[in-house]
Amino acid sequence: MIEAYETDVFMDPIGMKVWEKRHQYVATKLSALNCKRVLDMGTNTCKLIQRLSRSLQFTQIDGLDIDGQLLETQGIQNAKPDLIQNQYASMRDHQLVVNLYQGSALNKIQHLKDQQYDAVILVELIEHLQVEDVFLIEQNLFGFLRPQFVIVTTPNSDFNVYFNFKEQGVLFRDKDHKFEWSQNQFQIWAQKVCQNYGYKVIELTGVGEHKTEGTKNGFCTQIVVFEKDTQQEKYLNFAFFNLQEGEIRQVCQILYPFESKEQHFQREVVDSIRYILHITDKQNQFEDGSYQNYTTLSRIMQNHSISSNWQIQGDYFKLKTYIQNISEFLVHENQFNFQESFVTLNYQAQMEDEENEDQLESDSENVKMQQQQYYFSNDNCFSTKDTTYSSFSTADNLFSQKIQLGQQQMALEEIELEDTIDY
């Protein structure tokens, strides 16, 4: 409803829309609070998860929504790694797991409580509930799940004067909204939550300023950030909570590509030595047509990134040990060899006879297998294909589908989701 007014109403020098501002605020705040495990209640099309996944701090991002079909289509599409995420793999040194669940935010679900989230986020969700259901989501969120932090965003009805709703006979910004709070109503609700559940407000703010009048009528979207107050918690009694037990269906689990510190280090070693060998002028030529580039340990030690970043200044034994440890990895069908004080890169001659061609093909397959072992950190997370999508079931029928996403080798290809996806 408000999209038609964005150009005329909102002030933003770089042209960000209000929903983008909300996501930007949430991502920035979660980063400042050092949250690693978060739940997005009412995740919808998973646009917020897409934004959060670009941060390297998170280890788990879960999304919950009542609309399973939406999660299976747009949700999965937005939550899976894109080209940016695959480029991030070399910077992400821990696994990021994204889980999408179909279920109600009004029911208590032990599986979600067991995740021990650092933060739970409600972005433009609460206004879609019936007024009587607000109390239920309060109980579930602040009484049952009890994360350390809670972020809630909702429309500010005071700001609606700029939308000319009366002339159009419109009451709320969206036809599915059951109510919209004024700034005063929102603050009163936040205060009651703190009193009833042992939380405190650490920030009350918003996003979306009017183009000419600024925050005269507040922000377009109002935001509150709660933090659990451990001093009050021991005096609270949650026995009166009568939430119904609920069930959830896990729509998918997505494992983001990452590179452990050891893998990252080994790759840097290989890349640095290959570069040094590539630019060296020293070369041996053999009768069979093969040739060999080589360099000395002292030449490698002179490389600034090796001596500084690897903390091995002058320690030739340590450098030799590193090189020996990585000598098993083959790169571009050529092998590193370590002999005495020299490091060499061997290039095989062109093979003409059929026997040698078969041997070369076999060697090439071995090379590919070893490269896969090097670049893919976990067989359960990665495969030689970009994506494998399969359906399965368990005894408790909790898990229905699973996505295993691997690191891309070239560029992403556009695909359509089917029962089985392989690309």
Curated annotation (Swiss-Prot):
By its UniProt entry, which Gene3D superfamilies does this protein fall under?
Vaccinia Virus protein VP39
Inactivation phenotype: Defects in programmed DNA elimination, and inefficient production of sexual progeny due to reduction in the level and length of piRNAs.
Entry's cofactor comment = Binds 1 Mg(2+) ion per subunit.
Q: Can you say where in the cell this protein is located?
A: Nucleus
Which chemical reaction does it catalyze? small RNA 3'-end nucleotide + S-adenosyl-L-methionine = small RNA 3'-end 2'-O-methylnucleotide + S-adenosyl-L-homocysteine + H(+)
* Nucleus is among the record's keywords: yes
Cofactor or coenzyme needed: Mg(2+)
Q: Which GO terms describe its biological process?
A: programmed DNA elimination; RNA methylation; siRNA processing
Task: Give the record's keywords alphabetically.
Answer: Magnesium, Metal-binding, Methyltransferase, Nucleus, RNA-binding, RNA-mediated gene silencing, S-adenosyl-L-methionine, Transferase
Q: Can you name one GO molecular function term for this protein? A: small RNA 2'-O-methyltransferase activity
Keyword Protein biosynthesis, does the record have it?
no
Which residues of the sequence carry a binding annotation for Mg(2+)? Answer: 124, 127-128, 177
**EC number(s) stated in the UniProt entry for this protein:** 2.1.1.386
**Which InterPro entries does UniProt cross-reference here?**
Hen1 (IPR026610), SAM-dependent_MTases_sf (IPR029063)
Q: What does the annotation say about its assembly with partners? A: Interacts with TWI1.
Q: What does this protein do?
A: Methyltransferase that adds a 2'-O-methyl group at the 3'-end of piRNAs, a class of 24 to 30 nucleotide RNAs that are generated by a Dicer-independent mechanism and are primarily derived from transposons and other repeated sequence elements. This probably protects the 3'-end of piRNAs from uridylation activity and subsequent degradation. Required for programmed DNA elimination.
Q: What is this protein called?
A: Small RNA 2'-O-methyltransferase
Organism per entry: Tetrahymena thermophila (strain SB210)
Q: Which gene encodes it?
A: HEN1
